[in-house]
């Protein structure tokens, strides 16, 4: 129903929440949620910078992480901001290209991981539990994380259907994106991490390191496409959606002003690095 409302009438989640929370309530809640959501984009920028540094190292170019990590992270944010400033049409075509390319890369990555490490060894990996944590507590923490993940994305997912021209397009675009494409990439990342653990005994989060170790340095170029395009595109789409969320509560504020404020905010979080350091609590 939220998708149909957004497509047919242009009434997204935050507009029809005014009937429950009122204009001031929506303004406060949308701002708080967007301020929190932007922390994830600082993590994405940090992942972009670390992957680019690691990729450069694979080809013999050593970059000082203390200098280049914040520089490359802010570059990711700036490139994403340019996409967001381009408006819905630029975002539409950017995502059409990115999703197609990244799906192809994702399929290749999964095949390579299963080729490098037998499936039976991947599925045999047991979860690592803290000594003071029971299996039930571990499950509860995982469930809480999944609920938080779904909640944070739902605040954005129910805005994007406004870009669709038909109800059918809005419905299938939203359903396939969050029901098929996003879970596929989560699963692909999990397969890569488990395969890396089987080979090295260490859990790794950087796809550049995982691909280069599992499949050779040549395949690390796939991570350049995966990480660079994905995180820059994520910055652009995320900036657009979250700024539109805030604008739903404060319609008189300029969209471009919100995007530029978001750029400064996410860049500051990226340079600080605290969100990634305390990601579990975040």
Regions found by a protein language model. Give the residues of each.
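Hydrophobic, small-residue-rich membrane helices and short re-entrant helix-turn-helix hairpins
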Residues: 86-99, 152-184, 202-208, 238-254
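Transmembrane helix-loop junctions in multi-pass membrane proteins
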Residues: 6, 45-52, 81-90, 112-123, ...
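Hydrophobic, membrane-embedded alpha-helices of multi-pass small-molecule transporters
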Residues: 112-116, 128-194, 215-236
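Hydrophobic transmembrane alpha-helices that form the core helical bundles
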Residues: 26-62, 228-248
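Juxtamembrane transmembrane-helix boundary signature
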Residues: 1-21, 30-45
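Membrane-water interface regions at transmembrane-helix termini and the short interhelical loops
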Residues: 3-4, 20, 28, 54-60, ...
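Transmembrane alpha-helical segments of multi-pass small-molecule transport proteins
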Residues: 30, 59-86, 100-111, 138-157, ...
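Selective recognition of specific alpha-helical transmembrane segments in multi-pass small-molecule
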Residues: 1, 33-42, 101-113, 145, ...
